[in-house]
């Protein structure tokens, strides 16, 4: 998929920060597999998978499962990225019931392979305490191998960069 329109990366000099609006720009699953086949197993490779920008909510799980199955032979672990603020509507991805369904679906698929792979969950930094508690409970219940905290924040609080500049870049 194309990702978000360019410019997608903005430096905030006064804040020693960056605004990232990449949007999962990439050449696609097949192109990734071509590159991964070149790996001579000298490195540990992780598969960071997420929904496509255009995928409607009823297709989210299918996106994850398709990527998981196709990449399984080529990666050492997986990251279920449910935290990218740059791929359109992602509120459902942080819903406890949906997350449980997604994790269990991926774990079921993982169990069909001769060698299962570790699965981690990448979460957003802007979750509220209730959401964090639910995710911690879910990670413990499903016995995921870990959590990656965190992805890009959508918060623009406490920045030195002036509001006019922030509005002009997003």
Language-model features: where?
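Flexible glycine-/small-residue-enriched beta->alpha junction loops
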Residues: 2-29, 35-39
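Conserved alpha/beta-domain cores
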Residues: 23-170
């Amino acid at each position: 998929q194309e990702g978000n329109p360019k410019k997608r990366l903005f430096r905030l000099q006064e804040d020693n920060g960056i605004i990232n609006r990449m949007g999962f720009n990439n050449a696609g699953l097949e192109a990734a597999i071509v590159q991964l086949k070149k790996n001579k197993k000298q490195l540990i490779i992780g598969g960071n998978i997420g929904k496509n920008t255009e995928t409607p909510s009823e297709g989210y799980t299918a996106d994850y499962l398709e990527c998981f199955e196709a990449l399984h032979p080529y990666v050492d672990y997986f990251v279920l990225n449910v935290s990218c603020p740059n791929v359109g509507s992602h509120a459902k991805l942080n819903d406890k019931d949906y997350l449980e369904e997604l994790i269990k679906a991926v774990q079921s698929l993982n169990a069909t392979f001769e060698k299962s792979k570790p699965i981690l969950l990448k979460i957003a930094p802007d979750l509220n305490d209730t959401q964090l508690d639910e995710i911690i409970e879910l990670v413990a219940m499903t016995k995921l191998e870990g959590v990656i905290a965190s992805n890009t924040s959508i918060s623009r609080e406490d920045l030195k960069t002036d509001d006019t500049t922030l509005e002009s870049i997003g």
